[in-house]
């Protein structure tokens, strides 16, 4: 790969990192072509972009964005790496867990950046999967706001039935 090609890839990765709220780092080494194709198809269906990138180019892209990536330098940026980009924090984690349920251990979660916070290690995958999306939070808030109104309406409805029965 020439320096010009590397510079283009670094620029692309930097733009994707800057434009996405979340990126995950995975290890897909040892996956068969069929497994990779199935994983990419699943990513596409969930709106997640998956791209295999050399660690040195990921580091340079992060440096270009002035992001302190020292938390990722350990296990996350060693070995083969694939990047997953998403605007919803929990979607890549849920996607990885769903793919693993099919009996495939790879791609393996190595680390993630969620709203500029780093999560490194396999043990963080469950926590990331449990993060609620914006839509889920809005739904919870609406349900909480509707509950008192529904109680009042229910109470008024019961009162009107009692009044109608007495009349």
Swiss-Prot record:
GO terms for cellular component: large ribosomal subunit. It comes from the Bacteria. Keywords: Ribonucleoprotein, Ribosomal protein, RNA-binding, rRNA-binding. GO terms for biological process: translation. It holds the Pfam family Ribosomal_L10. InterPro entries: Ribosomal_uL10, Ribosomal_uL10-like_sf, Ribosomal_uL10_bac, Ribosomal_uL10_bac_type, Ribosomal_uL10_CS_bac. The keyword RNA-binding applies. One of its GO terms (molecular function) is structural constituent of ribosome. The keyword Repressor does not apply. Forms part of the ribosomal stalk, playing a central role in the interaction of the ribosome with GTP-bound translation factors. Belongs to the universal ribosomal protein uL10 family. Part of the ribosomal stalk of the 50S ribosomal subunit. The N-terminus interacts with L11 and the large rRNA to form the base of the stalk. The C-terminus forms an elongated spine to which L12 dimers bind in a sequential fashion forming a multimeric L10(L12)X complex. PANTHER family: 39S RIBOSOMAL PROTEIN L10, MITOCHONDRIAL. This is Large ribosomal subunit protein uL10. It comes from Cytophaga hutchinsonii (strain ATCC 33406 / DSM 1761 / CIP 103989 / NBRC 15051 / NCIMB 9469 / D465). The gene is rplJ.
């Amino acid at each position: 790969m020439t320096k010009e090609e590397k510079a283009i890839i670094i620029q692309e990765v930097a733009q994707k990192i800057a434009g996405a709220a979340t990126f995950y780092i995975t290890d897909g080494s040892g996956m068969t072509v069929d497994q990779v194709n199935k994983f990419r198809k699943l990513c596409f269906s969930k709106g997640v972009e998956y791209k295999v990138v050399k660690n040195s180019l990921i580091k340079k892209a992060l440096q270009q964005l002035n992001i302190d990536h020292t938390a990722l330098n350990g296990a996350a940026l060693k070995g083969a790496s694939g990047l997953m980009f998403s605007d919803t924090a929990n979607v890549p984690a849920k996607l990885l867990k769903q793919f693993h349920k099919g009996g495939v251990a790879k791609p393996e979660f190595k680390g993630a950046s969620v709203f500029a916070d780093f999560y490194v290690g396999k043990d963080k995958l469950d926590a990331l999967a449990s993060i609620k999306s914006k839509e889920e939070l809005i739904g919870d808030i609406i349900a909480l706001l509707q509950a008192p109104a529904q109680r009042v309406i229910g109470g008024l409805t019961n009162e009107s039935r009692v009044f109608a029965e007495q009349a």
